[in-house]
Amino acid sequence: MRDIEEIIKEIGLGRDDYELYGRYMAKLDLGLQNRGRPRAKLILVTAMTPTPAGEGKTTTTIGLGQAMKKLGKNVAIAIREPSLGPCFGIKGGATGGGKSKVEPSDRINLFFTGDFPTITAAHNLLSAMINNHMYHGNELNLDPKRITFPRTIDMNDRSLRSILVGVGPRDMGVLAGDSFVITPASEVMAITGLSLNYQDLKARLSRILAGFTTKNKPVFAGDLKAEGSMAALLRDALKPNLVQTTEGVPAFVHTGPFGNIAHGTSSLVADKIALNLFDYVITEAGFGSDLGAEKFFNLASRIGDLPINAVVLVATIRAIKHHGGSKKEGEDIDAVKTGSKNLIRHVQNIRNFGIDPVVAVNRFPTDTDGEIRALGEILDSNGIKWALSEVFAKGGEGGIDLANKVLASLGSHEIKRTYDLKDDIRTKIEKIARNVYGADGVIFEKKALSDMKKAEEIMENPYVCMAKTQYSFSDDASLLNDPHGFTIKVQSINISSGAGFVVPILGEIMTMPGLPKHPAAENIDLTDSGEITGLF
């Protein structure tokens, strides 16, 4: 691994443009997004509906960047920071794999430059100030039963989904129900990822909805005078992190909103700085085209005024067979043929946004030549561009064909958004449900209708950031492959007025995940020499 300063000098940055965090990590100055050079080409990486283990979207993003570098391109990648929840939960580390990783992987996975703890602290500072205000006289007349801002922690802990605070004598605070969300679902995480400068950051923080008064009036973080101290905590967290891939490609790794319960992309400042420093930028969006990619097209790229010049859609034989109902070990051509419907539907989603994607078939050792050949024939017959990707095993060399096809697909596209910003919230939700998920309709529970009314009173033309299972186009994780004839049920709608969007809660999705029966944490260890093992 090279010193990060060597890579920074190759980029052409001066000493005032960055701050070192050890030998291998750095933070970049926010002013770099205003350099004013010609805009680069942005390549978005998304995926088909995944299995719980994931389909290698981050690995593909990294490997594609390495392949483009081998072709002589001036390229960088932009991915999200890992959360401790998945690291210790099902997935383990989230920095790529094999010969296509970002380094130093162990540090990036475990606290990195401190952005996640800082965002968690800023979020919980507001929670503390809300309760403190009610304890000391409650001048704003906040209703303890109508506090809408939860607490946060970067850990999967189902026991914190619903709690009581202030239990005990009067000096323990105000007794009230409360809850935790995981840090990637925190509104402060979203705000950090969407803010472009400190002025923007403070304005967004001040607009966070804290709760309502006993007379049903909204109270914001600005009313509690919390935005200044929150912004002070977030000063360095707003600056994007620069590291490198296995083969020395510059890698922006910044903020970490989940794609299923948040907006699912790396920070706008990371993308914008990368676009000003490189000719090609590859950025990823969480989970499938129905989640992270939908939010990138309809939300993030709109807010950041980002181009989208090409899309890569990651698929695996494993996931295709899963959606095809495969129950047997070894080759299963019939399951490939059946499960390919899921992939084709994701391709159509991207085409509906105005871009013809390139499918990257991320090869696993268990894939047979017959299965790959069968999938290739299906893709060819549907006019879908595709390439076999072997970047896990071979690094950049394993992605040359993919890189060439992606470069050939680059263009200036007129993006077709799913909804108009002037649409009302109900219409926006229904358009996403029908046009992206393929739902027949949407059912709004009583609480969702009440929440929607409040949101429309508080916010003007908000974006919509759906919270939905990643395992199905529907809101039911058991409906695999290419479901039809289903309706979406909106249980409630969270108001993220600081971030500028509402979060409809669909089906049984949780904003605080739980650990599996045998979490990845059981396999992680520290050796006597200080080496971390079991993260991958």
From Swiss-Prot:
Catalytic activity: (6S)-5,6,7,8-tetrahydrofolate + formate + ATP = (6R)-10-formyltetrahydrofolate + ADP + phosphate
Signal peptide region: none
GO molecular function, one term: formate-tetrahydrofolate ligase activity
GO biological process assignments: tetrahydrofolate interconversion
Domain of life the protein comes from: Archaea
SUPFAM superfamilies associated with the record: P-loop containing nucleoside triphosphate hydrolases
Annotated residues for binding of ATP: T51, P52, A53, G54, E55, G56, K57, T58
Pathway: One-carbon metabolism; tetrahydrofolate interconversion
Family from the record: Belongs to the formate--tetrahydrofolate ligase family.
Protein name per Swiss-Prot or TrEMBL: Formate--tetrahydrofolate ligase
Organism: Thermoplasma acidophilum (strain ATCC 25905 / DSM 1728 / JCM 9062 / NBRC 15155 / AMRC-C165)
